Amino acid sequence: MILDAAIVALADLPGTWELIVPNAGIASMHTAVTRYGTVVLLDRTNIGPSRKMLPKGHCRYDPKDEVLKRDCYAHSVILDLNTNKIRPLKILTDTWCSSGQFLPDGSLLQTGGDLDGVKKIRKFVPCGPHGFCDWEELKDVELETGRWYATNQILPDGSVIIVGGRAANSVEYYPPRKGGAVQLPFLSDVEDKQMDNLYPYVHLLPNGHLFIFANNKAVMYDYTSNKVMLEYPPLDGGPRNYPSAGSSVMLALEGDYSMAIIVVCGGAQFGAFIQKSTDTPAHGSCGRIVATSPHPVWEMEDMPFGRIMGDMVMLPTGDVLIINGAQAGSQGFELASSPCFFPLLYRPNQPLGLRFMTLTPGTVPRMYHSTANLLPDGRVLIAGSNPHYFYKFAAEFPTELRIEAFSPEYLFADKANIRPVIDESPEMVRFGEQFDVFVSVSLPVVGSMEVNLASAPFATHSFSQGQRLVKLTVSPTVPDADERYRIVCTAPPGGKIAPPGYYMMFAVNLGVPSVARWVQLVP
């Protein structure tokens, strides 16, 4: 079923939209939120002019560029969330369909791309809104194998595994490990005539192994021995990865952290890409599996409508926002139609058949090359959409330079009296450490609050690389002073549960999150 916003009754649908930047200068293909209240937005080179100039004297000279050998336009920018102002950044080589991940020190690792960027490794060391930090291309190291459409995942020791890519059915690491790239036959086995194994979904399980999903199959992979520990049953419903991608999340880790549940939703019908069929309806099925079970099976459920290129965003509450994308076609340039304006809320703890809620629709088509990222204030930043090889504004689905924010229902004004405010919390905690969080709430707290850690992933191509939500073990919430409460929290026991790095720490009261404070988790 293809849903038309014009014929749907819109009364009482939850959520609100706001335009925060009318012209970012670039269409963001890749987006990441830093601990300084800024957002890195990244497109690609070899496309000619963007709509944001580099500072005078900072032009990029690249004899290999296919369009501009002397390029004075920015293809990356940084957004200050406090002022909504944009500052241009400079990238040197092509980051088209590349991958990324934050490192334990808070720097953003960015790998691969196309053409002269396919083996490059870049870093962005974030700074405050008044700083002048910029991209750095590493000169002393590069990828062993060119990586285009790969996926990055931080590991328990803080290193990063880089999985797959076009004509790269292998894995490698940053920092580089002895032996270079290691073949992963699973990626070759699931490749079909239209690929469908690119940008694989990679989740770090609490047992330390990786859940790797590509096309319609998944394995549990022990990267330390390069062995497949478990082959999961195939997921019904067609391919799920680029160029047929839906999206995927690992649900919140909680309790004793031993159970990990993976959800995969949406995707294109097989053949839509290779036939260049823009009107083939996307499928709306979702599969949910307990990846740590000794006998895992997929539990199937259906979204209210089909979706290709949706983004699944873990909210601070443990619910999942599904947003962006189209209802027909596939990924690729000008290969989709029927924008999917309606977000969905997936509520994991509801019974099967009652987990999806349709939310207030947007008005801006967010098609191929769109992104969605959780912000520290609980909103979700929506950026990008460029279903064309170059920037093209006179089109049915134009290159999109606007940045929006979607506010879930928990940010509504009628929740203000139960919304917690974190007054005190540590800036750094060690694995397994007990620590206090002090919060204020206007109305008396009933029961216990949650304290949840949310990673800052690298969002691109309908998958947030490194996305993670960990619900901390907490003591009963006890009064400390007027409208103030003390929560004794225990940090995750190790990097298998939450790899070292910076996390947004939210207090959640009756399903309403605070504004997050950043905390660094260290061994």
Swiss-Prot record:
One of its GO terms (molecular function) is aldehyde oxidase activity. It is found in: Secreted, Cell wall. Gene3D superfamilies: Galactose oxidase/kelch, beta-propeller, Immunoglobulins. It is an enzyme of class 1 (oxidoreductase). Induction: Induced by infection by the grapevine powdery mildew E.necator. CDD domains: E_set_GO_C. One of its GO terms (cellular component) is extracellular space. One of its GO terms (biological process) is defense response to fungus. Residues 1-19 form the signal peptide. InterPro entries: Gal_Oxase/kelch_b-propeller, Gal_Oxidase_central_sf, Glyoxal_oxidase_N, GO-like_E_set, Ig-like_fold, Ig_E-set. Pfam families: Glyoxal_oxid_N, GO-like_E_set. Keywords: Cell wall, Oxidoreductase, Plant defense, Secreted, Signal. Its main location: secreted. It catalyses: an aldehyde + O2 + H2O = a carboxylate + H2O2 + H(+). Its EC number is 1.2.3.1. It comes from the Eukaryota. Catalyzes the oxidation of aldehydes to the corresponding carboxylate by coupling the reaction to the reduction of dioxygen to hydrogen peroxide. Substrates include glyoxal and other aldehydes. Involved in disease resistance against the grapevine powdery mildew E.necator. Is sufficient to confer disease resistance to E.necator. Can produce hydrogen peroxide in response to E.necator infection, and this may directly play a role in the defense mechanism during plant-pathogen interactions. This is Aldehyde oxidase GLOX. The lineage of its organism: Eukaryota, Viridiplantae, Streptophyta, Embryophyta, Tracheophyta.
